[in-house]
């Protein structure tokens, strides 16, 4: 309990229905004021204001005291509702609350005053919760009247009571049916009235073991029209009864807890499981009327607590009025600290008693802990991994239920179709989907067009020049074969050496233009090449004539002397390159190289000479590195013609793509074409990755109903990204695992997509995509999916670890185990120890420290070798490994440069180490014949051992 406010008035009260409600109070009739005054006032309090709660915002004197106050909900022309007061003289007066607060004028705010009740006081009144302008009043002589506050016409009576009542103590409207009301009085009965039939329809009474209940108050269930609760103010039977009118012979629950009569009840409108009561025992008690349990009791007052009410719009707050001159406003929850913490532990007795006298020592006592409905979770929901939705709630009987369902996110069809196409390897359907649908942007459309060309024509078809058309069918066939294997590339090299490049054939075909099928049938086999007649000298000639220069005479003489090398040098001196080239045809390779260099040096500014140089060298490094990238297709054709194998082709064509992109960022389509031809998946994917944000922005601009938020656009963009990668991998016949220096950001993006689709329950597709990633990157996600699917999980082994394990397994499978015994192993080990000890005079180190390492056994098929003795070290130190070892070492497996180091990975078990592996028995050499053991060392006495130790130190 937290006390919010305290009003020092002996007054009845009524809450407004504002979010932060106001409190109207009126001096209560039938009680003496604390100041022994007979005056009466009507006041309004802003109880939740930190500055105004101690003083009323409106106060006015009235002629008579009140028995009851009521505050209606707003209705027509009444923005803050009406305040109705029941006076002790039988008068009922109505005030406009809005005018009353603004004008502070009681007479101006009064809208009606009636003395319809004759012969006594009006004890109770209440506004209808459904028809807010309708009021019911009850008073002396059993009079009950229903008022229409819109017209203030003549009020009417609901009918004749079955049992006459002398006084009506409480009237209450049904919260669900507007024409039903209940009344109770001093006759001991509660009557149920139907205004439509204008009669009393039910009559309730109760007699318990201790006597008959004298009903003082009645309240309806907040939502169920057939249930209500009554209170008895009888000293002999102070009970609270819950009723179901469908069986009105006996109450459903009898709640006992008050020691004296109950004067007031209020059933919480927001929570049917909360009911508050107060009575003659000065107690205020909180109940659960559904279960008939007492929840707790609040601090008692000094006199009767004659009225208690929840704040209608703030049910966590309630007010209690008592005859001790106070109205206490407090919370139903107890959040106050214990009394012991409120009073300081002072050693001064006077200070202790002074603090104790002003401290609230009473605190509520709760027997049952129950959260109010506005703090309960009637239903809880949680998303689970794998597109699971867990819902916890209650069924119609109030029992807890647990439901696990699967929900589908927008765009799930794309993921399902992707899985279907991956299974069936129907990548053409993926390409057609993107080409036939609306283009997101030009870059995306261009990418899918290139992939379409790759699927139809292969890599070589990416560089076909429509204007040139110089490639022959045989050349395309050779290029396609070279993409598959190095053996095919070798065959193509032979064709190139034999002159089967097809260019002359195509030119010839263009000249002929006859369309003869026989021409195409023999295309590329040399049958259509132009022939040159064989030169045969004829006629007489002069070796020298009058015009022959000295240099020509010198050259002629050198040729006639068969000094061809000198003749070539002479030609080069005279800059006669043509003659030098002819002479070099039948000369040594050295001479040919000299003439070539002279030619290229002379014509180094010629583009044709540069191309000829690359062709004669059969090396396109210069072409790729320095040729103008504007002619990138011609460069690509040169790479295709002169690359020696598929690895060189991929490397050079990817390098060309790098140059294109570096030269002009806008030429990304040309660069991607080169990357696709070179199988540079990491570079292509990195470009696509950089363009993802723009692709997402373009997606949000489309009219796609599946894309209405950035997160949905992100999912679709990632789906397209993965589709491109999978399609390219399939058409380019690449390996299953991504590799390359740019694999880390690509892997992270694929992992993001895997996380999204696995969260949507697409575990099969997620597993397929995880196969793209290196084991060190995908390991955690694989284990997560395995656990979600209930499959047995196995330790994730990286490729490097797997390679080392394979080498180790192959070694041990080839060791001749029959030749190994523990006896000769120990003998060899001891022999090495004793030999070293004898030669140096040092004490022998333990045998276990010089055993050969696990990886240094002899492998079958290698040259046998003996174990070399380990170098001697100082006493107590482990020997260091020698730089040259006779033991074979396993190749170091490639590791992922982007993977985080794992200190627990056994990646050093094959390194030469003097420390033996704990799981292996003492080792010996398994290659050749073991050397004979040296003579045994005689035992030295203690004196000799001490001298030897001193020398070593």
Swiss-Prot record:
Protein name in the entry: Protein transport protein SEC31
Instruction: Name the species this protein comes from.
Output: Lodderomyces elongisporus (strain ATCC 11503 / CBS 2605 / JCM 1781 / NBRC 1676 / NRRL YB-4239) (Yeast)
Q: Which family does it belong to?
A: Belongs to the WD repeat SEC31 family.
The cross-references to InterPro entries, in alphabetical order and at most eight, read:
SEC31-like, WD40/YVTN_repeat-like_dom_sf, WD40_repeat_CS, WD40_repeat_dom_sf, WD40_rpt
Keyword field:
Cytoplasmic vesicle, Endoplasmic reticulum, ER-Golgi transport, Membrane, Protein transport, Repeat, Transport, WD repeat
Which coarse location class applies to the principal site listed for this UniProt protein? membrane
The way this protein sits in the membrane is described as: Peripheral membrane protein
Q: Which domain of life is it from?
A: Eukaryota
- This chain is encoded by the gene named SEC31
Give residue spans, biased composition: Polar residues. 860-887
Location of this chain's protein in the cell: Cytoplasmic vesicle, COPII-coated vesicle membrane; Endoplasmic reticulum membrane
Query: From start to end residue, where is composition biased (Basic and acidic residues)?
Result: 473-506, 941-953
